[in-house]
């Protein structure tokens, strides 16, 4: 299996929305809303609103045999406009997701490594993310150098120096 990584293009936005749904509703159970319902949640809408129009927006798409299977992006937020994982205006928040059929195959690691390298080249010094405490991706984030910064009852805000 060969995983290809590429900078996102405007045409990738529908796939990024799919991946955002996969990331937010990662638990595959009977409580998972439909894609249409989940995509309408205010926090989900906010995450990709006006994507690519803000300075610093950066994303990567992972493909296998030209089929998109995962994506990640980071974005800067403000104290008046932010998503979970926000720390301050100088620390972009990372969002990552891999289609459930392609998890546990190293795709998440490759995506994070690519984005960290991109962040280094862009002069970014830190990156944050939010993860539920029971999300199996927590171990991936720790392996990739993210550390718990704050304990938010059911989730952690994590921070990584770049």
Residue ranges and their predicted role:
Residues 25-48:
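Conserved GNAT-fold acetyl-CoA-binding loop/helix
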Residues 63-96:
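Conserved acyl-donor/pantetheine-binding loop and adjacent beta-alpha core of acyl/acetyltransferases
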Residues 112, 119-132:
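Conserved GNAT acetyl-CoA-binding A-motif
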């Amino acid at each position: 299996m060969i995983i290809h990584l590429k900078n996102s293009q405007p045409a990738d936005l529908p796939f990024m929305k799919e991946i955002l749904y996969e990331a937010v509703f990662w638990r595959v159970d009977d409580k998972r809303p439909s894609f249409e319902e989940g995509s309408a949640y205010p926090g989900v809408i906010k995450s990709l609103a006006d994507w690519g129009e803000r300075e610093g927006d950066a994303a990567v798409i992972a493909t296998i045999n030209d089929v998109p299977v995962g994506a990640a992006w980071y974005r800067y937020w403000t104290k008046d406009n932010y998503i979970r994982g926000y720390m301050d205006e100088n620390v972009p928040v990372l969002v990552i997701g891999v289609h459930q059929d392609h998890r546990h195959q190293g795709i998440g690691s490759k995506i994070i490594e690519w984005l960290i390298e991109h962040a280094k080249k862009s002069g970014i010094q830190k990156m944050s993310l939010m993860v539920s405490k029971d999300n199996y991706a927590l171990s991936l984030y720790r392996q990739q150098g993210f550390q718990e910064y704050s304990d938010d009852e059911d989730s952690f805000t994590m921070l990584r120096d770049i």
